């Protein structure tokens, strides 16, 4: 069943493009980009989510990330 979001595709795509532009501007390699984005996720969870919900949110995020990974052999 498809997920229904309260955010428009345009909002998501615009924010994604801006974040990618920052990483490209700094010529951040993939490992640094992943470290920074991971730290950002951790910071958001720790500062914006009630402590009782943090583990569940982190688990849900991890599952969503894993399910969105494309397993083709391109790289």
Curated annotation (Swiss-Prot):
Q: InterPro entries recorded for this chain?
A: UPF0352 (IPR009857), YejL_sf (IPR023202)
Give the top-rank taxon of the lineage listed in the UniProt record for this protein.
Bacteria
Q: Which residues form the signal peptide?
A: none
Q: Which is an annotated Pfam family here?
A: DUF1414
Protein family according to the UniProt entry: Belongs to the UPF0352 family.
Name of protein = UPF0352 protein YejL
Gene encoding it?
yejL
């Amino acid at each position: 069943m498809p997920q229904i979001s309260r955010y428009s595709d345009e909002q998501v795509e615009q924010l994604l493009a801006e974040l990618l532009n920052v990483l490209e501007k700094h010529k951040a390699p993939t490992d640094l980009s992943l470290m920074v984005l991971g730290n950002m996720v951790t910071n958001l969870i720790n500062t914006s989510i009630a402590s009782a919900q943090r583990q569940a949110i982190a688990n849900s995020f991890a599952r969503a990330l894993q399910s969105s990974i494309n397993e083709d052999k391109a790289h």
